[in-house]
């Protein structure tokens, strides 16, 4: 019996793509369709094969570029559409994460806090999204939880790093977290920040989680290099009367993070923790429309700070000026003929929020968000 396999090849140039495709052809793969430019710096070619094929690149990386993911819900797995681990959300053997939960996946292999484990669509953030399953999910296929962008950021960066290197994601996000409101929670060196931790700031449990896990990722291997921090946060501060304090509190935390990491300067991109870029992502149109003044205060403060190593990445609209898709049912509909079920199929009890347009969709987390974040990392690093 033969099985059909699908995969994608990513490359930084036509010549790079040709070289990689040549290797795949020797392994029994065939091109499927034509190459597509998914970013100005990335070509992608779908490939397919019948029967047994060689799966290349399955060896463990010698070392890792470390990318920290921090902030609140739009920084993590809050995409409600059905996870697609057999296709769009397929893991890659060169992309790992630092563990937090007791098993790699629900009911899967055991792991311990800060182990290096495979990364997938639902990373080990402070808030556990792995049990909020889509009603159409087939858990036997790994379609558990919700969809985030971390895996996809890493996939888009793979063509630009050495073949013996991988990407180690450090997930430290917590939905509903803010600088100016929210429970502080607790921190343990053995388990990280508690799930009820929802307050950012110097010395807070979420900060202790962030800095300790970043250090742990670098301590895993002296060759590991901290490449960037991807930060998406500000929504929950907008609803606070003290929202204007957020920019100063963020800057104080950024300064402290760099100071605390200075002992690892040799493992930081550019040779200093101060040179590691903070890539600060935008939010959905709902927040700007609802809290216009507050949005400008908080997200405006991320802008025009390139000289400080802070880079703002807009997500409000796509290249045609259309609002980036959210979990609103009309923006992530079901497509039964294709076997896809979006946020539209979720109801109370399995939604990430009843206010659907407050969070980006699964498709946005596979496309425009990682495309732009990865491009910003490449431009800044």
Q: Where are these predicted regions, by residue range?
A:
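Terminus-proximal functional modules
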Residues: 1-56
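Cell-envelope and extracellular/periplasmic
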Residues: 54-381
């Amino acid at each position: 019996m033969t099985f059909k396999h699908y995969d994608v090849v990513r490359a930084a140039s036509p010549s790079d793509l040709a070289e990689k495709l040549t290797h795949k052809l020797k392994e029994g793969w065939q091109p499927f369709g034509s190459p597509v430019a998914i970013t100005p710096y990335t070509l992608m070619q779908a490939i397919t094969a019948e029967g047994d094929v060689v799966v290349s690149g399955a060896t463990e990386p010698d070392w890792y570029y470390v990318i920290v993911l921090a902030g609140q819900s739009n920084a993590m797995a809050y995409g409600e559409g059905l996870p697609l681990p057999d296709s769009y959300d397929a893991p890659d053997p060169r992309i790992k994460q630092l563990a937090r939960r007791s098993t790699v996946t629900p009911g899967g292999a055991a792991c311990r806090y800060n182990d290096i484990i495979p990364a997938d669509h639902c990373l080990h953030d402070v808030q556990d999204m792995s049990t909020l399953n889509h009603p159409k999910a087939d858990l036997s296929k790994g379609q558990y939880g919700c969809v985030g962008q971390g895996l996809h950021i890493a996939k888009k960066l793979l063509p630009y790093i050495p073949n013996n290197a991988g990407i180690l994601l450090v997930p430290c996000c917590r939905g509903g977290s803010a600088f100016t409101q929210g429970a502080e929670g607790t921190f343990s060196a053995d388990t990280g920040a508690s799930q009820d931790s929802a307050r950012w700031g110097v010395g807070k449990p979420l900060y202790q989680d962030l800095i300790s896990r970043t250090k742990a990722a670098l301590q895993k291997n002296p060759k590991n290099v901290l490449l960037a921090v991807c930060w998406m946060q500000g929504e929950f501060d907008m609803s606070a009367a003290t929202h204007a304090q957020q920019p100063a509190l963020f800057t104080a935390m950024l300064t402290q993070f760099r100071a605390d990491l200075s002992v690892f300067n040799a493992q930081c991109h550019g040779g200093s923790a101060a040179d590691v870029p903070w890539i600060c992502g935008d939010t959905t149109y709902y927040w700007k429309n609802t809290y216009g003044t507050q949005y400008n205060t908080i997200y405006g403060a991320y802008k025009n700070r390139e000289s400080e190593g802070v880079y703002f990445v807009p997500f409000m609209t796509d290249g045609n000026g259309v609002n980036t898709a959210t979990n609103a049912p009309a923006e992530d509909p079901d497509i039964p003929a294709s076997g896809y079920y979006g946020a539209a199929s979720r109801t109370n009890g399995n939604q990430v929020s009843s206010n659907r347009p407050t969070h980006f969709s699964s498709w946005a987390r596979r496309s425009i968000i990682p495309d732009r974040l990865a491009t910003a990392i490449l431009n800044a690093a």
